């Protein structure tokens, strides 16, 4: 049993509140336990200069944490004048993950911006961001289809993400902050609804892990992501 009374293979309490804000084409407040992230999707006509004239769309992401999302206040990155390497890494991960959902050749020359703002952090902010932003992206697609009448549905399928870790030889699913800080190994996994891998980010924090332990963590991640995608479908009414 874990510090929050979960089993090792159990997700935290997960929720998705769609249409959370008024103006964005898609918006979701996603909660992974005490981690809460506001994910908004904004649609703009046009694409980056290097894509102009190719008939393709683009999807990109930005990520940030509110100053008091954690135990102590962190200065806004805008006030510091630059983004941290961590922020840049995470928003690239989110963008890559969400582009796997969409056939960009069917999106027209439109750009969808996914903004993921962490309101409260207790571990797994990047995996919560991917999983919540996927729903916001679906709602934004519906908005495009209503107003721009795309010739074909660009949706390929859902994606979701979860963290797993290894501590004292045991695999843990969906780490909170305390678990993430104390585990021997942590791994972030992003997958499609077909069970394909998009991203694997793994680090041995305290000691190296074996191939068998890697397999244990990936099996656990597959289980968790299948459950998350089922929850996404329920939230979308599918």
UniProtKB/Swiss-Prot annotation:
It comes from Psychrobacter cryohalolentis (strain ATCC BAA-1226 / DSM 17306 / VKM B-2378 / K5). It catalyses: tRNA(n+1) + phosphate = tRNA(n) + a ribonucleoside 5'-diphosphate. The keyword Transmembrane does not apply. The gene is rph. NCBIfam families: RNasePH. Its EC number is 2.7.7.56. Phosphorolytic 3'-5' exoribonuclease that plays an important role in tRNA 3'-end maturation. Removes nucleotide residues following the 3'-CCA terminus of tRNAs; can also add nucleotides to the ends of RNA molecules by using nucleoside diphosphates as substrates, but this may not be physiologically important. Probably plays a role in initiation of 16S rRNA degradation (leading to ribosome degradation) during starvation. One of its GO terms (biological process) is tRNA processing. Homohexameric ring arranged as a trimer of dimers. One of its GO terms (molecular function) is tRNA binding. Belongs to the RNase PH family. Phosphate binds at residues 86, 124-126. It comes from the Bacteria. Keywords: Nucleotidyltransferase, RNA-binding, rRNA processing, Transferase, tRNA processing, tRNA-binding. This is Ribonuclease PH. It is an enzyme of class 2 (transferase). Pfam families: RNase_PH, RNase_PH_C. CDD domains: RNase_PH_bact.
């Amino acid at each position: 049993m874990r510090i929050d009374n979960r089993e090792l293979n159990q997700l935290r309490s997960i929720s998705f509140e769609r249409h959370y804000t008024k103006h964005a084409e898609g918006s979701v407040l996603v909660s992974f336990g005490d981690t809460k992230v506001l994910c908004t999707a904004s649609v703009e006509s046009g694409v980056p200069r290097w894509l102009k004239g190719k008939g393709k769309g683009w999807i990109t992401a930005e990520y940030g944490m509110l100053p008091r999302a954690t135990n102590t206040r962190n200065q806004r990155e805008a006030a510091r004048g630059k983004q941290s390497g961590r922020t840049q890494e995470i928003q690239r991960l989110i963008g890559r993950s969400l582009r796997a959902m969409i056939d960009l050749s069917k999106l027209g020359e439109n750009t969808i911006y996914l903004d993921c703002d962490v309101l409260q952090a207790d571990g797994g902010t990047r995996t919560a961001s991917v999983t919540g932003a996927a729903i916001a992206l679906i709602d934004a697609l519906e908005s495009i289809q209503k107003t721009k009448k795309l010739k074909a549905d660009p949706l390929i399928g859902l994606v979701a993400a979860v963290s797993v870790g290894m501590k004292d030889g045991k695999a843990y699913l969906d780490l909170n902050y305390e678990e993430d800080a104390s585990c021997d190994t942590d791994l972030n996994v992003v997958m499609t609804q077909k069970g394909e891998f998009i991203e694997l980010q793994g680090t041995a924090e305290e000691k190296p892990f074996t191939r068998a332990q890697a397999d244990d963590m990936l099996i656990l991640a597959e289980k968790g992501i299948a459950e998350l995608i089922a929850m996404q479908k329920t939230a979308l009414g599918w």
